[in-house]
Each structure stands twice: as structure tokens, then as C-alpha cells.
């Protein structure tokens, strides 16, 4: 009778939970999972539980009572296991020497592969810092590098912007301590730390509200006095990088832009006060910020954790790094075996990143239901938080294809402020864009921007501006000469190897044969029509 009662009670509990969850599901819209397409081989079930009941909704007592007795279902581990990396043998329960080698090789490969993915944001920032120091000759925080003639394709930044005047700042708070950054009205952009985490915005979305001012960047662990009169921000790392930018309509180009920066921008340690700054025009200068796709990336990881405080990374990440021989405060000398594993891990991690970025399985990646345009910020925030977790695939999509973390490009800003980006790797038919073919994008009239819009073409191998005979692979509403308009005010932009007959050159972006390309639309100062989607861009269309 007691057994009958317990079964009857369990049945009532399962029914109640089923009805409760059905009610919940009817009122709450859930994100659809695309993972169902990636099925695993069927395995035998060891738990007999009603499939309509969400196990996560059950208390621990009900959960345990719903399972068969452990001793009934116990099955010892297998002596022989077939895996994708070979057969594993455990005669008598213990591994053979061959199995030990295979498992440790695979374990190290998996850990190294995941570390490459997890540390990609920090590696990307490390590449930015290295590229500026190595290729631009930056040797102190008081060197301000300016793309006074705009950023051309020689500057290999991930999906760099061809239309703005950039000011690149390399800050070293370990060397300089609290550092002052003076910015004028008309300059905007983020300051990001060595982990590529957002520190502060400058400009209309920053503390200066677009009026300019003095920012004081405080290093980790600093406990000294902080004077008044500054916009004070705290960084969790010593090394920081800023991508400030200005509209050429405000600051001009070339020498005019350099004059504006020299007269209005300064960077110096708080301790020393203003010191001599060096201003250099880096337009047309070759610079590579890309993360190595081989074992060198793991040397970068070692450099990162060696320079920054341990608190910037956390014990879990540092523990996984230590498991493959990368430990803070100790030499990093991988043997031939580990170098080979790290080379393979980098290749596999990059392959995963390319698939995640170019064919993302998250349905929230699409901006519009019936268009191919995607947002680099799938979560619509710069932290990649989704409720109580971090969307690690969304984070990888962004950092593998873009630079510069700021809420101003992700979160909904007031109409006319901030900027929003959209990208597509595919044409209207859902096929990847092919450099051997000819395409057209019609920018419909009345693009919803308070400032300007631009369309830029990138190389899927580097994710940087595509390198062709055009130094600036873009078309924009502020381009000179202006792109030709159709009678209704729309703009047709063409993508092909050669200029199509009868098409104005300012409406054409050159592509490369035998490789793909992808396209970004940038909206500067997006207005209400952008946010409420009463204006929707066309897809890129195949001509032939």
C-alpha cells in the first residue's frame, strides 16, 4: 500500500508540474534552439521520467524519487571506447600506455582550443596594442596616432571604418599611474581594457555628454588621492586602448585634422601634469592587429597574464592556462609536443570562429525576419549578457569580426545618438557573397540617420577592409564626389571585380576574384525609423 501511495503521489506531482509548465510556456516566448539540427548518436536512457516535465523545475527530493534505484541501473565503465581520436582501452579498468597518450593529447588539445576561443577578446586587444607599438612606433601614452586622411585598407583593424578620423591611444597605467586624457567637443568613442572590456565612453554617450573634458583613468589597485575636476573611470587592467573618432565634416582631413588634434587633445600622467605630446598621421601606414592563428597566440596569452593583475582573469581561467603550461610568474617553454598541439588548437578554434561568425545558428542574430542582415551585437548589449549567463557564441561573433566595445553601438540609444551596424555575408538568396560574381545593394531613400551612413566591404579571411585598387572600399552619404542617386532618391551600390559599364565609380566597391567578401552598413545617429523598423534595408542582390 505504501508503494502504491508513493507512486500515486509521484503521478500527481508529475501531472501538476506538467500543467504548470504548459501554462508557463503558453505565456512566455522562448528563444528557439537551432542546436536540434546537430544531433548526436542515440544512447540508451538510464532515467525513466516523463519527457514533458522540465527536470530543472523539480525540487531535489522529487527529482531523486523519479529515478530508478541506483544499484539496479549501475553499469561499470567500458573497457573499450571508440572515439574520433582512436580506440581507448582500459583492460581491468586501467588505461593502456597508448590510451594514456591519446587522452592527454586530446585533453590538452581541447583545453587549448577552448582557451583560444575564451581569450580571443583579450588576444584581439593585445594585437591592437602590439600593432600600434610595433607598426606605428608608439612608445608612450603621449603619442597620439591619427588617421588624418581616414582609415584605408593598409590599417588592418577588424572591420575598420573608412569614413571617420580615428585617434588611437595606447595607455600604460602600470608605467604612468593615473592618466589624464583631454578631449574636445566633437570627439567620441570608447576606452577598452586589455581584456577588451568596456571602460568608458567619450563624447555624447560619455560622461562629458559631448562637451569634451578631462578624463582620469585609474589603474587597478590604486589607493591614492583622486583630485576633483575630472571624469573619473576605473580600469581593471594596466594596458588600455582607445578608439576615439571624429567626423571629418567637423575636424576636416589631412593637415586640418592634425591641427585640430594637436590643439585639443592631450594625454599625460596625472603625476607629471601636461607634457609634450607627439601627434602622427598614420593613414597609409601598414599595420597588423590580427591574432596569430598558430601557437604564437599562446605566447600572447602568457604575455597578457604576466603583465596584468591576476584579478583581471580569475582563478578558473588561470587554472586552465596552467594546465597547458602557461603560469603567471613562471617561464613559458612549451616542448615540441605542446607546440604542435597549440598549432592545431589555434587552427581548430579559428575554424570554429569562422563558422560561428559567418553562419551563426542563433536566430536572434538576424535583425529582420525576411532579410539577411545581422547585428554584430546579437545580445544587443556590449557585455553579451543574457539574463543570468554570458552568450559566449555572441561574444565570439563580435570579437572575431570587430573592434571596439561600447554600449553606444549595442544598446538602444536616444534617437539621433550613437551608431548601429549591420552586416551580411549572404545575398538575398541566402548564398555566401562571391567575389567572382556581380551584386547590387539598393539603399532606399531617406536612410534613417541624423548624421550619415556608409557601406563598406571586408575580406572574410582577415575581417579587415578588402585590399584592392581602392584604398577606401566603401560608399557613403558623405563621400566626395557624392554617390549618384536614382530618381526616387535611392542609391545603387555595386560590388564586382571591375567597374560595371555605365555605373558611376563612386557607386562601386571592388571585390577580389576567387574569394568571398562581406558588407557592413553603418548608421550614424540612427533615428526612430531605424529603431521601429519602419525603414528596412534591402538585401544584397545577385546580378550575374
Report residues per predicted region:
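Bacterial N-terminal signal peptides that target proteins for export
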Residues: 1-9
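Alpha-helical transmembrane segments
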Residues: 12-16
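C-terminal motif of bacterial Sec signal peptides marking the signal peptidase cleavage site
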Residues: 18-21
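Bacterial lipoprotein signal-peptidase II cleavage site
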Residues: 23-31
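A compositional/structural signature for long, glycine/proline-rich flexible linkers
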Residues: 35-544
Amino acid at each position: 500500500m505504501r508503494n502504491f501511495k508513493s507512486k500515486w503521489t509521484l503521478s500527481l506531482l508529475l501531472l501538476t508540474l506538467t500543467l504548470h509548465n504548459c501554462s508557463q510556456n503558453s505565456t512566455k516566448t522562448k528563444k528557439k534552439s537551432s542546436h536540434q539540427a546537430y544531433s548526436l548518436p542515440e544512447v540508451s536512457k538510464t532515467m525513466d521520467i516523463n519527457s514533458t516535465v522540465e527536470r530543472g523545475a523539480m525540487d531535489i527530493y522529487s527529482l531523486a524519487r523519479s529515478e530508478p534505484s541506483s544499484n539496479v541501473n549501475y553499469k561499470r565503465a567500458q573497457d573499450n571506447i571508440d572515439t574520433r581520436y582512436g580506440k581507448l582501452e582500459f583492460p581491468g579498468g586501467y588505461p593502456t600506455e597508448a590510451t594514456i597518450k591519446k587522452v592527454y593529447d586530446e585533453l590538452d588539445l581541447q583545453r587549448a582550443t577552448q582557451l583560444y576561443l575564451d581569450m580571443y577578446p583579450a588576444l584581439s586587444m593585445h594585437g591592437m596594442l602590439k600593432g600600434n607599438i610595433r607598426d606605428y612606433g608608439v612608445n608612450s601614452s603621449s603619442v597620439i596616432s591619427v588617421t588624418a586622411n581616414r582609415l584605408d585598407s593598409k590599417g588592418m583593424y577588424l572591420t575598420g571604418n573608412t569614413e571617420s578620423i580615428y585617434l588611437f591611444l595606447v595607455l600604460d597605467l602600470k608605467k604612468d599611474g593615473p592618466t589624464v586624457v583631454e578631449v574636445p567637443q566633437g570627439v567620441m568613442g570608447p576606452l577598452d581594457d586589455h581584456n577588451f572590456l568596456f571602460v568608458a565612453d567619450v563624447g555624447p554617450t560619455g560622461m562629458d555628454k559631448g562637451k569634451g573634458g578631462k578624463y582620469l583613468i585609474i589603474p587597478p589597485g590604486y589607493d591614492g588621492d583622486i583630485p576633483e575636476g575630472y571624469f573619473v573611470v576605473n580600469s581593471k587592467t594596466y594596458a588600455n586602448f582607445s578608439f576615439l573618432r571624429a567626423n571629418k565634416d567637423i575636424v576636416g582631413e589631412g593637415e586640418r585634422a592634425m591641427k585640430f588634434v594637436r590643439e585639443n587633445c592631450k594625454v599625460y600622467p596625472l603625476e607629471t601634469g601636461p607634457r609634450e605630446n607627439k601627434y602622427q598621421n598614420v593613414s597609409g601606414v601598414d599595420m597588423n592587429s590580427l591574432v596569430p592563428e598558430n601557437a604564437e597566440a599562446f605566447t600572447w596569452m602568457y604575455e597578457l597574464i604576466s603583465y596584468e593583475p591576476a584579478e583581471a582573469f580569475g582563478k578558473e581561467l588561470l587554472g586552465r592556462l596552467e594546465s597547458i603550461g602557461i603560469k603567471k610568474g613562471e617561464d613559458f617553454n612549451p616542448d615540441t609536443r605542446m607546440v604542435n598541439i597549440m598549432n592545431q588548437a589555434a587552427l581548430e578554434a579559428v575554424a570554429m570562429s569562422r563558422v560561428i561568425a559567418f553562419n551563426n545558428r542563433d536566430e536572434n542574430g538576424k535583425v529582420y525576419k525576411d532579410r539577411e542582415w545581422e547585428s554584430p551585437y546579437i545580445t544587443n548589449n556590449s557585455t553579451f549578457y543574457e539574463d543570468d549567463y554570458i552568450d559566449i557564441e555572441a561574444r565570439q561573433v563580435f570579437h572575431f569580426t570587430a573592434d571596439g566595445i561600447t554600449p553606444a553601438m549595442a544598446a538602444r540609444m536616444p534617437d539621433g545618438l550613437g551608431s548601429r551596424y549591420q552586416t551580411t555575408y549572404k545575398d538575398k538568396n541566402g548564398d555566401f557573397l562571391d567575389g567572382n560574381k556581380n551584386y547590387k545593394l539598393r539603399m532606399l531613400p531617406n536612410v534613417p540617420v541624423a548624421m550619415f551612413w556608409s557601406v563598406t566591404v571586408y575580406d572574410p579571411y582577415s575581417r579587415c577592409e578588402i585590399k584592392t585598387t581602392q584604398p577606401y572600399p566603401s560608399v557613403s552619404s558623405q563621400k566626395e564626389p557624392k554617390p549618384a542617386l536614382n530618381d526616387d532618391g535611392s542609391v545603387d551600390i555595386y560590388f564586382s571585380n571591375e567597374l560595371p559599364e555605365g555605373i558611376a565609380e563612386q557607386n562601386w566597391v571592388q571585390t577580389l576574384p576567387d574569394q568571398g567578401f562581406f558588407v557592413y552598413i553603418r548608421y550614424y545617429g540612427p533615428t526612430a525609423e531605424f529603431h521601429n523598423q519602419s525603414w528596412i534595408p534591402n538585401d544584397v542582390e545577385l546580378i550575374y
